[in-house]
């Protein structure tokens, strides 16, 4: 197996740095967002990635990397919201938010390592566009679960879907050689 753990950590370090810098700029204003709002933000980013992948002409000179980073960070925020609930006002300082971020990343990385072992790193043979489609599918599932007030009969919950979106986004960035070029 390739050094997935190290590549994963490289991508997360870049995402984490951006998260911290945005916390310093804006505080934790995101704490007032309800889960459907975060899900919609992730959906916008995933749709933009799909558009960029399908269209030859771009009116804004950006690639998919920033959108995948956004999916990662918004998904981590959603996991934090699932744990803490929505706040009426920003209520976390940079240190506490970063601690929560790191906790969610560790749980998500542990999940990735377990699945990666069982699936034999099959994602390395996938196309980035397929990972985008899987993220969009997960988003549709999350929206349905949200519409069902969080209840599922036999399916995994919202948290597992957010974790999968984080991992798929990291896989996509690794496949795009992100982190090795930056």
Q: Where do the protein language model's features map onto the residues?
A:
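Intrinsically disordered, low-complexity regulatory regions
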Residues: 1-182
């Amino acid at each position: 197996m390739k050094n997935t753990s190290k590549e994963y950590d490289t991508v997360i370090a870049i995402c984490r740095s951006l998260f911290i810098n945005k916390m310093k700029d804006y505080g934790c204003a995101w704490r007032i967002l309800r889960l459907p709002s975060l899900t919609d933000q992730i959906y916008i980013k995933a749709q933009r990635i799909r558009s960029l992948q399908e269209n030859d002409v771009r009116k804004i000179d950006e690639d998919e990397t920033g959108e995948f980073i956004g999916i990662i960070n918004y998904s981590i925020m959603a996991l934090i919201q699932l744990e803490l609930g929505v706040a009426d006002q920003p209520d976390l300082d940079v240190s506490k938010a970063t601690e929560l971020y790191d906790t969610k990343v560790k749980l998500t990385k542990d999940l990735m390592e377990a699945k990666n072992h069982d699936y034999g790193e099959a994602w390395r043979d996938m196309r980035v566009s397929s990972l985008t489609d899987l993220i969009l599918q997960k988003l549709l599932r999350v929206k349905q679960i949200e519409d069902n007030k969080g209840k599922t009969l036999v399916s995994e919950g919202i948290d597992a879907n957010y974790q999968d979106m984080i991992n798929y986004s990291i896989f996509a960035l690794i496949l795009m050689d992100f982190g090795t070029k930056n």
